[in-house]
Regions:
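Short linear Ser/Thr-Pro motifs
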Residues: 1-2, 105
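Short, small-residue-biased leader/transition segments that mark boundaries at the very start
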Residues: 2-8
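Active-site and adjacent substrate-binding regions of carbohydrate-active enzymes
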Residues: 24-226
Length: 226
């Protein structure tokens, strides 16, 4: 029907996007001339942007760091324009924040002090969940585990920056693996199963009191499956 055809035309053709977006971004990047707005974005986001662009340039691509800064600049610019449009229509956007970060990522690469590591900078433990009726060996997620004592000493600065940035992008934030803030399951690094893991205390309400003190009352959804 014509109605169905109209709906189809409004949908994103992700296959075509995947095939062409990097090529078009590179073309746009080489034509781009940094302006004051771009320079302000780089300055305002220097606490994460420099590490991210260096990481992406060295590990994921042969493109220069400035290319990835350019991509982030336009993503944020377009995303916030979309968010304002939605908010003006009375629509709130819900984001999703993972509890852990990846071993192969900027946080672990540049900030080993945030995690439980040995003298060589390797994880001593990783995250997961214990054996249960659904998985007799448990689950080994292989994410580095936070050194919560360090985070507490810094008044959770890294977490405050992370959450603040996400609440700039979203109106409501779903916190994945919410129980990890209370207790998290810690598994020896290198173990293939979760059999020899154990529960450890997370930051609890201390982190959220610090969050409220810094950012005020915020809309949070607590994931309740684990």
């Amino acid at each position: 029907s014509s109605a169905a055809s109209d709906v189809y035309k409004r949908q994103v053709d992700y296959d075509t996007v995947r095939q062409n977006h990097r090529k078009l971004l590179r073309k746009a990047y080489f034509r781009f001339h940094p302006d004051e707005e771009y320079k302000k974005f780089v300055k305002d986001n220097e606490y994460w942007l420099g590490e991210y662009t260096e990481y992406m340039s060295k590990k994921k691509s042969k493109l220069p760091e400035s290319y990835f800064a350019f991509c982030q600049y336009y993503f944020h610019k377009q995303w916030l324009k979309l968010k304002k449009y939605a908010n003006d229509k009375g629509i709130q956007i819900v984001g999703d924040l993972p509890f852990y970060v990846a071993l192969d990522g900027t946080a672990f690469t540049y900030h080993k002090e945030l995690f439980k590591v040995d003298e060589e900078g390797k994880p001593t433990v990783v995250g997961g969940c214990p054996p249960d009726a659904f998985a007799e060996d448990g689950q080994v997620w292989s994410n580095p585990v936070y050194d919560w004592e360090y985070h507490k000493k810094t008044n959770y600065e890294w977490w405050m920056n992370r959450l603040c940035h996400n609440f700039m992008l979203y109106d409501v934030l779903r916190l994945d693996h919410f129980r990890g803030f209370d207790e998290y399951y810690s598994i020896p690094y290198g173990d293939k199963t979760a059999e020899f893991g154990h529960w450890e205390k997370g930051p609890g309400m201390d982190l959220f009191r610090t969050l409220e003190k810094n950012l005020g009352k915020l809309d949070v959804i607590a994931e309740d499956l684990g």
